[in-house]
């Protein structure tokens, strides 16, 4: 396990061979296969152990006592402290595992599940719905609490902000994240009335398959279709050519590699989704309604194109640094939609815009992994509520998310 952590940190997980691991660990090939079925099996075992250690640090800090907000901050700082002290291990858990296929993702998520429970407990106490000895329901049966999707989104924001710094080797930025992230999460309260599922269907045309304008876009959509079928790592140029109804020769006339074409596919999704967001938000009568319209348009865009959504939101984590940078630019664009909110609530933590963008990315990611389509459209009210709450409060954010009443300034 130690050899995997070291080599993955040096070379990246996808480039590792069992022979490399055996050589560094100093064990016989037979001894390795007595313990593990292969490299991926070793990854699952290693990520499980790392996740348990990260959760242990968070839970230990949380249980030291104090008010709920103090314990929440301690838990988040515990996870961050683990990432600072065990950078290579944390990178394998919070970054590399998410590009190594569904089993690795599910294993990495198990470590985060315990942290989600701590966040849910603290927020339930802050909302007056639980005591320190009561565990909140995480299945959505507690109508007075934040929904499980909202809890996953808030915790997912913590994960993504840590993972981004780890991936870019900016570990020095991690210690300063704990206090503002905890303050941002601790501010949330449940909506006064349940958030509604979106009414009716998407705007006509939003579920239509994107029509490629030229051969290059046909190839990009073929890339997404092939990745949707097989996953990024397993997809070959022959798969892309078949799904794009073209030849490998034609592919090379436009792109040098699968990696280059995929980055362009991420760019295509970014441009088209942001255009949909802007078009919808500009028609809104005020800023809160613009946020709701924009996020609804974003959800409708990805709901209408499942292969592209799977590729550029989920499989992007397997596609390398350049593609991930482009994806983070898309997430940052959501944050820019929130900038007017700081005029309404100037005391909102500066990190809120980045964190909310990451929370919404988590909602999209989870909904797409769960099947996409209508599940993606269904997250729009939760995304709207999470985006608006820090700036206009629970009542107004709920009214806007449910498309009822008039938004009010936070008082």
What role is predicted for each listed range?
Residues 59-88, 134-143, 278-307:
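Hydrophobic alpha-helical connector segments
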Residues 81, 117, 121, 125-128, ...:
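C-terminal peripheral helix-coil segments that are non-catalytic and often amphipathic
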Residues 1-4, 21, 46-50, 54, ...:
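Generic hydrophobic, amphipathic alpha-helix propensity
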Residues 8, 36, 41-53, 93, ...:
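Alpha-helical DNA-contacting segments of helix-turn-helix folds
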Residues 4, 16, 54-55, 89-93, ...:
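Short, structured motif recognition centered on aromatic/hydrophobic residues
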Residues 102-138, 145-160, 176-183, 320-362, ...:
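Amphipathic alpha-helical packing segments from all-alpha helical-bundle domains
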Residues 7-41, 226-260:
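Helix-turn-helix
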Residues 84, 164-167, 217-231, 238-241, ...:
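Long compositionally biased, domain-poor regions of proteins
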């Amino acid at each position: 396990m130690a050899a995997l952590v070291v080599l993955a940190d040096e070379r990246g997980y996808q480039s590792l061979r069992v022979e490399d691991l055996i050589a560094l660990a100093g064990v016989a090939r037979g001894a390795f296969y007595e313990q593990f079925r292969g490299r991926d099996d070793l990854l699952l075992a290693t990520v499980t152990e790392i996740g348990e250690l990260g959760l242990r640090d968070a839970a230990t800090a949380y249980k030291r006592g104090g008010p709920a907000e103090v314990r929440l901050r301690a838990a988040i700082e515990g996870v961050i402290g683990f990432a600072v002290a065990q950078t290579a291990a944390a990178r394998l858990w919070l970054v590399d595992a998410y590009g190594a296929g569904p089993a690795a993702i599910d294993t990495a998520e198990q470590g985060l599940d315990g942290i989600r429970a701590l966040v849910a407990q603290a927020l339930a106490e802050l909302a007056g719905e639980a005591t320190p000895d009561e565990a909140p329901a995480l299945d959505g049966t507690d109508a007075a609490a934040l929904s499980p999707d909202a809890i996953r989104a808030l915790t997912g924001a913590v994960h993504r902000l840590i993972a981004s710094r780890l991936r870019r080797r900016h570990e020095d930025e991690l210690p300063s994240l704990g206090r503002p992230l905890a303050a941002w999460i601790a501010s949330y309260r449940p909506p006064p009335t349940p958030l509604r599922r979106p009414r009716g269907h998407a705007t006509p045309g939003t579920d239509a398959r994107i029509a490629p304008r030229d051969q290059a876009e046909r190839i990009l959509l073929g890339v997404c279709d092939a990745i949707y079928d097989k996953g990024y790592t397993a997809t070959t140029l022959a798969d892309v050519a078949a799904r794009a109804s073209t030849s490998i020769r034609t592919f090379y006339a436009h792109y040098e590699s699968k990696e280059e074409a995929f980055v362009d596919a991420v760019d295509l999704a970014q441009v088209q989704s942001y255009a949909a967001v802007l078009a919808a938000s500009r028609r809104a009568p005020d800023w809160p309604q613009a946020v709701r319209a924009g996020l609804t348009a974003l959800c409708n865009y990805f709901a209408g194109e499942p292969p592209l959504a799977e590729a550029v939101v989920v499989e992007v984590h397997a596609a390398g640094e350049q593609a991930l940078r482009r994806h983070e630019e898309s997430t940052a664009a959501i944050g820019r939609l929130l900038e007017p909110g700081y005029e309404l609530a100037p005391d909102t933590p500066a990190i809120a815009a980045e964190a909310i963008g990451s929370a919404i990315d988590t909602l999209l990611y989870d909904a797409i992994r769960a099947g996409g389509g209508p599940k993606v459209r269904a997250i729009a009210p939760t995304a709207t509520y999470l985006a608006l709450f820090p700036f206009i409060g629970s009542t107004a954010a709920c009214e806007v998310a449910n498309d009822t009443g008039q938004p009010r300034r936070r008082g």
